[in-house]
A protein has these predicted regions:
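PLD/PLD-like phosphodiesterase catalytic module centered on the HKD motif
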Residues: 1-213
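Pre-Walker A adenine-sensing motif
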Residues: 216
Length: 216
């Protein structure tokens, strides 16, 4: 078979300096368009890619990014940054409304009649792209390939889901409020745990019954 079409195993190997990030950056820089579907996006995850995203904006390379409100994990500031790029369209699949989880991690890159796509375990977070134990597969296909047709079909289905998928301007303020409420709750829980740890645990002797004068 053609070596260019052989699947590749994409993972982080800190000892050898291998990172999932490098594979994604490489494909972004060579593509004519891209589509990304991930559950989680953080500021630290997109920061190393901002120079690349800005370069794609300058070249008018269109991109679509689909994420979710799952667990209120994605950072609104990261979403704001992506949405500010004129070449990127950002949408959010609302799992709270749909009543199901959303764990896709897929990166699709189109170059002429060829598609390269990375599918596996990596979200757009710093740890996933650089440090975590992650397993991904990179596949190369023509547009007619059965696998890419299935992937593209599922992406389009989720992207165009009218009931649960919202564009940036329609979801961001509501999501930002949900995210901030969750952050506040987590902060309160952490503070309560800290206080609980500081409280002295009474010794067993404190609970030992002492005989009164009549019992002596």
């Amino acid at each position: 078979s053609n070596l260019a079409y052989r699947p590749q195993f994409i993972y982080n190997d800190n000892k050898n300096g291998q990172k999932v990030f490098s594979s994604i950056e490489e494909e972004l820089l060579r593509c004519d368009s891209f589509a990304i579907s991930v559950a989680f996006i953080t500021r630290s995850g997109i920061t190393p890619l901002l120079q690349t995203f800005n370069e794609l904006e300058r070249k008018h390379i269109p991109g679509r990014i689909l994420t979710t409100d799952y667990l209120c994990f994605s950072d609104p500031e990261a979403l704001d940054t992506l949405a500010s790029l004129s070449n990127i369209e950002l949408r959010m699949y609302q799992t709270e409304c749909a009543g199901n989880g959303f764990h896709t991690k897929g990166y699709i890159f189109q170059k002429s009649e060829e598609y390269r796509f990375i599918i596996g375990s990596s979200n757009l977070t710093q740890d996933a792209l650089t440090r975590n134990m992650e397993w991904n597969t990179k596949l190369v296909s023509t547009k007619q390939g059965e696998m890419i047709q299935s992937v593209l079909g599922e992406f389009e289905r989720l992207w165009n889901e009218k009931k649960y998928t919202k564009c940036y301007s329609d979801f961001i303020e509501e999501y930002r409020k949900q995210y901030e409420e969750k952050q506040l709750f987590q902060k309160l829980v952490a503070e309560q745990k800290r206080i609980a740890k500081q409280e002295a645990i009474p010794s067993v002797e404190a609970y030992t019954l002492q005989p009164n004068s009549m019992q002596r």
